[in-house]
């Protein structure tokens, strides 16, 4: 049987009798490749790569053989003579990994500072000392951040203003940063129970579902009043506070608190603790009811006050667009039917046309003997083919400049890439969309209608057109935008527990204008009495106070 197997022949092994390593004579004909320790080893090829590194194309190339002096040119003997190049050949430097760094004219920090100073002086001669100082202080786009470290690039370009000036007699109670708030959770929250329903709703005009870029509609100005009364000014909440609940608020106040971790701008909420009852209020100013524009964008509006594209002007524009759109898409008119709720509008006035608004007063059990009573709202109603009614929350997104940073031109992408447009809005207006979603969930709306409204001209902030509409189910939309309702309820419950442990009095919750944190202050009872008197004196000049009249 052994004859069937091939014989085993021992391989030839080199043996160096006079030293260590391979024999010198045996490796004479082995080809040798020069090696430099600056070469990157360990990567032979990558068949899955889609594109090469454009910045360092010679990252994996050898340091030897790249320059012209090592190149071989096959030429005829009679053409071997050539003139000497006095310019010199261009030396291709190998890819370096941080070794042998020496400061030079270009990378020396001192020279960078000197060049920056000379550049500022030159700009000052052209633009004047005022604009030059602003350029030196805040930089100019990418050029202003080019020579800064990575950790400084994401800092705000300028300090934001606080929504309220903290006085010296205010006592700090608590400071909670956003990472701690994001860890809170209050799961298994049940749907709120209806207590009282008030108001009348117009029916939705389904013709606006067919609006697109080729069939746009002009946005009209609707002369209707929307009341934005705070908690303690609501007659229904005053009546309910005598018999039920111990925490009272409105949906916009709750949404602001629940979505505080997504906010960048400063805001404040006043809290009054009277025994076992807690009232969440907003101050008598119009800023709380204003909609923000590009609040969470990497480059929020930075124009000066008075400009059409300043933060305040854009906020006013977005607020009026939202009001007009929410009424225009409804079937208005005396001959149109209305869906009336159990009780009339509590803010009804003689001779004043109110906007289509349905108020729903609901209560939630937050545990630990906490019963929340809040006023929520619907904007419209629609009837299904089977006869069922669906309540709507109607909101509008507005485009103010298609050429702005981190934006997509709606007139080109809205019909074909609506998902990309909405994704961009979620990135630039994450806080505003989250608050709209929370308000819809609290009210129990069946649909959240979003409208896309754009300026007729980028420089004209008074005329707008409707480019399209889109609808979502609030709970599903909350999942799409990564809005955790358990975390929202946990944040609210945490702040309520902190206030319950404090003595009776007035408190204020404020979002820090420049830090991701919420501060709680104990303030005097007459803290905002001067603001109230100023508001009453200038009530004729305000665009809207407790009511928004467009």
From Swiss-Prot:
The keyword Protein biosynthesis applies. Keywords: Cytoplasm, Initiation factor, Phosphoprotein, Protein biosynthesis, RNA-binding. Residues 97-126, 530-550 are annotated as: Disordered. Residues 287-301 are annotated as: RNA gate. It holds the Pfam family eIF-3_zeta. One of its GO terms (biological process) is regulation of translational initiation. It is found in: Cytoplasm. One of its GO terms (cellular component) is eukaryotic translation initiation factor 3 complex. GO terms for molecular function: mRNA cap binding; translation initiation factor activity. The RNA gate region regulates mRNA cap recognition to prevent promiscuous mRNA-binding before assembly of eif3d into the full eukaryotic translation initiation factor 3 (eIF-3) complex. Component of the eukaryotic translation initiation factor 3 (eIF-3) complex. The eIF-3 complex interacts with pix. mRNA cap-binding component of the eukaryotic translation initiation factor 3 (eIF-3) complex, which is involved in protein synthesis of a specialized repertoire of mRNAs and, together with other initiation factors, stimulates binding of mRNA and methionyl-tRNAi to the 40S ribosome. The eIF-3 complex specifically targets and initiates translation of a subset of mRNAs involved in cell proliferation. In the eIF-3 complex, eif3d specifically recognizes and binds the 7-methylguanosine cap of a subset of mRNAs. Belongs to the eIF-3 subunit D family. This is Eukaryotic translation initiation factor 3 subunit D-2. The gene is eIF3d2.
């Amino acid at each position: 049987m052994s004859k069937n197997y091939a014989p085993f022949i021992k391989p030839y092994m080199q043996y160096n009798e006079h030293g260590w390593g391979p024999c010198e004579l045996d490796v004479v004909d082995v080809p040798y490749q020069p090696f430099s320790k600056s070469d990157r080893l360990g990567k032979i090829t990558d068949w899955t790569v889609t594109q090469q590194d454009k910045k360092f194309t010679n990252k994996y190339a050898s340091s030897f053989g790249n320059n012209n002096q090592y190149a071989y040119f096959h030429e005829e003997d009679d053409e071997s003579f050539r003139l000497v190049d006095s310019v010199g050949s261009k030396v291709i430097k190998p890819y370096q990994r941080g070794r042998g760094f020496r400061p030079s004219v270009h990378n020396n920090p001192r020279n960078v500072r000197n060049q920056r100073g000379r550049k500022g002086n030159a700009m000052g001669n052209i633009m004047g000392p005022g604009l030059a100082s602003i350029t030196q202080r805040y930089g100019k786009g990418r050029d202003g951040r080019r020579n800064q470290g990575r950790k400084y690039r994401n800092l705000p370009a300028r300090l934001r203003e606080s929504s309220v000036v903290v006085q010296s007699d205010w006592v700090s109670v608590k400071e909670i940063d956003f990472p701690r708030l994001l860890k809170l959770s209050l799961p298994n929250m049940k749907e709120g129970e209806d207590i009282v329903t008030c108001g009348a709703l117009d029916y939705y005009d389904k013709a606006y579902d067919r609006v697109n870029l080729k069939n746009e509609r002009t946005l009209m100005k609707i002369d209707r009043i929307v009341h934005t009364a705070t908690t303690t000014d609501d007659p229904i909440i005053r009546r309910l506070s005598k018999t039920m609940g111990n925490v009272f608020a409105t949906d916009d106040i709750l949404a602001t608190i629940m979505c505080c971790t997504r906010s960048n701008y400063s805001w404040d909420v006043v809290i009054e603790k009277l025994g076992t009852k807690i009232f969440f209020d907003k101050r008598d100013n119009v800023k709380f009811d204003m909609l923000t524009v590009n609040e969470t964008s990497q480059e929020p509006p930075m124009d000066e006050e008075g400009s059409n594209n300043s933060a305040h002007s854009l906020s006013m524009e977005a607020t009026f667009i939202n009001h007009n759109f929410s009424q225009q898409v409804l079937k208005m008119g005396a001959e149109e039917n209305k869906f009336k709720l159990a009780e009339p509008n509590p803010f009804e006035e003689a001779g004043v046309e109110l906007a289509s608004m349905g108020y729903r007063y609901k209560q939630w059990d937050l545990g630990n003997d906490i019963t929340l009573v809040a006023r929520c709202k619907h904007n419209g109603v629609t009837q299904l083919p089977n006869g069922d009614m669906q309540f709507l929350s109607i909101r509008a997104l507005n485009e103010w400049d298609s050429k702005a940073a981190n934006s997509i031109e709606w007139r080109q992408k809205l019909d074909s890439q609506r998902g990309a447009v909405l994704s961009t809005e979620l990135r630039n207006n994450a806080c505003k969309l989250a608050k709209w979603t929370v308000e819809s969930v609290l009210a129990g709306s069946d649909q959240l209608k979003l409208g896309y409204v754009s300026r007729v001209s980028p420089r004209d902030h008074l005329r707008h057109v409707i480019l399209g509409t889109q609808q979502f189910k609030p709970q599903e939309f909350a999942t799409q935008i990564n809005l955790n309702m358990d975390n929202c309820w946990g944040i609210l419950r945490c702040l309520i527990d902190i206030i319950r442990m404090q003595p009776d009095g007035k408190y204020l919750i404020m979002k820090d204008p420049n830090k991701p944190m919420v501060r709680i202050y104990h303030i005097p009872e007459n803290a905002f009495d001067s603001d109230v008197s100023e508001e009453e004196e200038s009530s004729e000049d305000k665009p809207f106070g407790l009511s928004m009249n467009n």
